[in-house]
Amino acid sequence: MSQQLQQIIDTAWENRAELSPKAAPADVREAVAHALEQLDKGALRVAEKIDGNWTVHQWLKKAVLLSFRLEDNAPMPAGGYSQFYDKVPSKFANYTAEDFAAGGFRVVPPAIARRGSFIAKNVVLMPSYTNIGAYVDEGTMVDTWATVGSCAQIGKNVHLSGGVGIGGVLEPLQANPVIIEDNCFIGARSEVVEGVIVEENSVISMGVYLGQSTKIYDRETGEVSYGRIPAGSVVVAGNLPSKDGSHSLYCAVIVKKVDAKTRAKVGLNELLRGD
């Protein structure tokens, strides 16, 4: 079934300029709707770890993008205090008490998750925003004013602190989603964008900004890398001097590495203070 869906969506993507809410083949509409339904349930996801490596299913990202071409904006009620006008309804628009109980997560007013995002059991959504195509795994906390961007992949037992920004892939269009692996802590007001991967058991301090062009400096080895935080890293904001010493530019600094056992035993503040 997935292979057939992929074929229909890949073909529709090549002809997307011809699609509109009033002009789209029935099989394309059905394929896109089914793909979004499966994303919403967590049966499919835009990226998944296979044999230790992350695989991105580009066709599912295409399905999300195609859905914007196939739907008109429409008024959406907002509990009597306002209205919204958009193409994508709330994930919880038609939820009953039984649906919430089966989902096993908490949604604190006025948290918003768009339909096509997946929220796993024991997740807590404080007043925050989770975009279409995102996957938020079990036991994760999405704290107040945090945003989980389109198609972002958030692992188990992750803490996204207040005001954290996890970038999406739709605007501007990105090749790969941001991935935060299991048991990571992302400090307040930090930003992770442009398909950066933060590997498991890592701690990102408050106010760290990570994109594909951000230098990641390993204090222990002196190496500079881009786009990936290694497992068990403790990362703080820093600066690297220019070659001529005339100025310095922002970077992220890996101040130490810890294993899962140490991470579990030692408080976050103690890890971040470092020597």
UniProtKB/Swiss-Prot annotation:
It is found in: Cytoplasm. CDD domains: LbH_THP_succinylT (cd03350). It comes from the Bacteria. Substrate binds at residues 106, 143. Pfam families: Hexapep_2, THDPS_N_2. It catalyses: (S)-2,3,4,5-tetrahydrodipicolinate + succinyl-CoA + H2O = (S)-2-succinylamino-6-oxoheptanedioate + CoA. Its main location: cytoplasm. One of its GO terms (biological process) is lysine biosynthetic process via diaminopimelate. GO terms for molecular function: 2,3,4,5-tetrahydropyridine-2,6-dicarboxylate N-succinyltransferase activity; nucleotidyltransferase activity. InterPro entries: DapD_Trfase_Hexpep_rpt_fam (IPR005664), Hexapep (IPR001451), Hexapep_transf_CS (IPR018357), THP_succinylTrfase_dom1 (IPR023180), THP_succinylTrfase_N_sf (IPR037133), Trimer_LpxA-like_sf (IPR011004). Its EC number is 2.3.1.117. Homotrimer. Belongs to the transferase hexapeptide repeat family. This is 2,3,4,5-tetrahydropyridine-2,6-dicarboxylate N-succinyltransferase. It comes from Burkholderia ambifaria (strain ATCC BAA-244 / DSM 16087 / CCUG 44356 / LMG 19182 / AMMD). The lineage of its organism: Bacteria, Pseudomonadati, Pseudomonadota, Betaproteobacteria, Burkholderiales. The gene is dapD.
